[in-house]
Amino acid sequence: MRILFVFSGNSAQKISPFIEEQINSLLDIGIDVDKFAIIGKGITGYLSNLKRFFNTIHNKKYNLIHAHYIWSIIFALFQVKIPVVGTFHGSDLMQNMTFFLAKNFVIPRLNKAIVVNERMAIKLHSPKVIILPCGVNVNLFIPNNSVTTNLSLNKNKINILFSSNFQRPEKNYNLAKQAIDLLQQHIDLNLIELKGFNRNEVSDLLNQVDLLLMTSIWEGSPQIIKEAMACNCPIVSTNVGDVKWLLDGVEGCFITTNDPKDVADKIKKALNFKGRTKGRDKLISLGLDSEHIAKKIIKVYEEVINNTSKKKVYGR
């Protein structure tokens, strides 16, 4: 089985870490995967990649294309010979226009649509939609007291890791700051911006900080929450995406409203927990490790490829 992953290559890393890790998890269990990064933004930027794209799929015989995010999915659908599976991650469907496009034009043309939480599946309401969150590399994100990277955390302060960089509006840093300001009157806190760290450093951070704080306005199935769970890190988060489902029943993890006082109160409760959680056990029980998710993805591929082959035979 040979799969072509199609995705935007415009970020600083050229590929989102969770897409890279999904590819690696498929490679680890014997699937042949190639990457196609779309370079350029906007309609003209995407269209400028079409010649290279058609050359790629002409030179190699692919059984299936797996595209991530709506614009890459639309791009992959410019060809009609190879079946396409598309993964929507949530952020790509927040605008009314993209949601309308996905529901009425994109998903009907896909062989299968993957979404990362139940809310998305209910809203899209299509028999082609399945729920399949991205998995976590539990061999990298593992409870570990020994630091392998030089993080230079201030051990005299309570260290709280914010879920993203402060500039992204959907991450709602202002709410986090308001809550921290309320607590600073009584506790010496250090709020760490999740920016510029490599994957090993993120794992070390989640093992060394006192808790992870997420105050997002919206999410799909946030990887950082699952990575924190894999490291047994206490968590405080707003009720976005599938976070409530993920954290349900995990002591030391708390869901908060968008009220700064409530966020501050939940932070205090998480700090008073004074220990590590059993988030890793919950994560694994949900089957959200990379290997387990990779096996589910392969079943999706096999179903699509088999159905496509049958249609070709019956169409003769």
Give the residues covered by each predicted segment.
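Donor nucleotide-sugar binding/catalytic pocket of nucleotide-sugar-dependent glycosyltransferases
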Residues: 108-144
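Short His-centered aromatic/hydrophobic patch
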Residues: 67-72, 88
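Aromatic "clamp/platform" in nucleotide-sugar-dependent glycosyltransferases that forms part
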Residues: 217
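Conserved acidic donor-binding segment of nucleotide-sugar-dependent glycosyltransferases
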Residues: 249-260, 268-273
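Short hydrophobic beta-strand element within catalytic cores of glycosyltransferases
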Residues: 234-237
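Acidic anion/phosphate-binding donor-loop and adjacent secondary structure
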Residues: 96-97, 136-152, 308
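A charged, aromatic-enriched C-terminal amphipathic alpha-helix characteristic of glycosyltransferases
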Residues: 272-310
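Conserved donor-binding/catalytic core segment of Leloir-type glycosyltransferases
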Residues: 4, 152-171, 177-181
